[in-house]
Amino acid sequence: MEVLREKYIKEVVPAMMRKFGYKNPMAVPKIEKIVVNIGVSEAVQNPGAIEAAARDLAIITGQKPIVRKARKSIANFHLRKGMPIGLKVTLRGERMYAFLYKLINLALPRVRDFSGVSPNSFDGRGNYSLGLKEQLVFPEIEYDKIDRIRGMDITIVTTAKTDEEAKELLALLGMPFKK
């Protein structure tokens, strides 16, 4: 999907230079990486849940996820240090743009009662996070092939210095923010 990268170069960079007064096109903020995370809490009782979630995440992102292990034991959660409890994928380059295109144009419109993503989910340093309640919004996932519905956290890391710059960058790329 060269679509978003071309849009960034041809439309976003000139618009950002006009709005924020950048002298150099290289100073314009860009998307650095996208991190997709799934917490698999049921992996404590059901070790096969990690494989199922990993398969779904690999299909969605096109990249094999890293298994995240518990850093410390927590007795109330029946959790031991070193147990697999989550999955993470860091997307950069072409896969990152392909995933972002798919998220904006295919997945988010399929979310039930979707009216736009929250404009308040910036972290103060120009990064944006959003959560999805189910992996079924991605067209590659078939309802019959999944063992259970899982949510995921998506963090878009940008080189923007402020939230205002990052919001403008994502809005110009097509992210549907609530009005």
UniProtKB/Swiss-Prot annotation:
<comment type="function">
    <text>This is one of the proteins that bind and probably mediate the attachment of the 5S RNA into the large ribosomal subunit, where it forms part of the central protuberance. In the 70S ribosome it contacts protein S13 of the 30S subunit (bridge B1b), connecting the 2 subunits; this bridge is implicated in subunit movement. Contacts the P site tRNA; the 5S rRNA and some of its associated proteins might help stabilize positioning of ribosome-bound tRNAs.</text>
</comment>
<dbReference type="Pfam" id="PF00281">
    <property type="entry name" value="Ribosomal_L5"/>
</dbReference>
<dbReference type="Pfam" id="PF00673">
    <property type="entry name" value="Ribosomal_L5_C"/>
</dbReference>
<dbReference type="InterPro" id="IPR002132">
    <property type="entry name" value="Ribosomal_uL5"/>
</dbReference>
<dbReference type="InterPro" id="IPR031310">
    <property type="entry name" value="Ribosomal_uL5_N"/>
</dbReference>
<dbReference type="GO" id="GO:0003723">
    <property type="term" value="F:RNA binding"/>
</dbReference>
<comment type="subunit">
    <text>Part of the 50S ribosomal subunit; part of the 5S rRNA/L5/L18/L25 subcomplex. Contacts the 5S rRNA and the P site tRNA. Forms a bridge to the 30S subunit in the 70S ribosome.</text>
</comment>
<keyword id="KW-0699">rRNA-binding</keyword>
<dbReference type="InterPro" id="IPR022803">
    <property type="entry name" value="Ribosomal_uL5_dom_sf"/>
</dbReference>
<dbReference type="GO" id="GO:0022625">
    <property type="term" value="C:cytosolic large ribosomal subunit"/>
</dbReference>
<dbReference type="GO" id="GO:0000049">
    <property type="term" value="F:tRNA binding"/>
</dbReference>
<keyword id="KW-0820">tRNA-binding</keyword>
<dbReference type="InterPro" id="IPR020930">
    <property type="entry name" value="Ribosomal_uL5_bac-type"/>
</dbReference>
<dbReference type="GO" id="GO:0006412">
    <property type="term" value="P:translation"/>
</dbReference>
<keyword id="KW-0689">Ribosomal protein</keyword>
<protein>
    <recommendedName>
        <fullName>Large ribosomal subunit protein uL5</fullName>
    </recommendedName>
</protein>
<keyword id="KW-0687">Ribonucleoprotein</keyword>
<dbReference type="GO" id="GO:0019843">
    <property type="term" value="F:rRNA binding"/>
</dbReference>
<dbReference type="GO" id="GO:0003735">
    <property type="term" value="F:structural constituent of ribosome"/>
</dbReference>
<dbReference type="InterPro" id="IPR031309">
    <property type="entry name" value="Ribosomal_uL5_C"/>
</dbReference>
<comment type="similarity">
    <text>Belongs to the universal ribosomal protein uL5 family.</text>
</comment>
<keyword id="KW-0694">RNA-binding</keyword>
